[in-house]
């Protein structure tokens, strides 16, 4: 019984420690944090939300399920190379970017989405909806379908 109680306590503290590790990281003059896979991570991101002016959310189109391991590239409106590149370990990303217009590309399962957003004093929320499977007909190009099938 003591072993089970100790294991449960250690698991609870491990989850809390993981949530506390989420903090804003710096890259190319932008600060960002991604996560939200569990309750603790979502709470940690909620505490960081006031620091962000871009909020990204990655979901499945049909069911609205959360996605993780999404490749994200943020481009300033006048740039051809990304000012920020990250892999979102969870369904949410918070970004503190200099004021301006941005193009944000997200790639998941071979499907790529590109949306525009303006970073101002008020946060802009950008939702990327991906098909359950890239070949299920939700805006997946023939190239995306072939790539997802491994051809």
Question: Each predicted region: which residue ranges?
Answer:
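Short, surface-exposed beta-strand/beta-hairpin micro-motifs centered on an aromatic residue
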Residues: 90-96
């Amino acid at each position: 019984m003591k072993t089970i109680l100790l294991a449960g306590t250690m698991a609870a503290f491990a989850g809390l420690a993981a949530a506390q590790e989420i903090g804003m990281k710096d890259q190319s003059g932008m600060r960002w944090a991604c996560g939200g896979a569990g309750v603790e991570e979502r709470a940690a991101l909620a505490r960081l939300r006031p620091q962000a002016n871009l909020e990204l959310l990655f979901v499945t189109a049909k069911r609205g399920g959360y996605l993780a391991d999404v490749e994200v590239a943020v481009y300033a409106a006048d740039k051809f190379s990304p000012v920020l590149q990250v892999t979102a370990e969870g369904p949410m990303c918070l970004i503190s970017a200099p004021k301006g217009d941005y193009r944000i590309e997200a790639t998941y399962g071979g499907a790529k989405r590109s949306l525009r957003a303006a970073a101002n004093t008020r946060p802009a929320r950008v939702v990327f909806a991906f098909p359950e499977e890239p070949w299920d007909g939700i805006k997946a190009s023939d190239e995306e379908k072939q790539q997802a099938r491994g051809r």
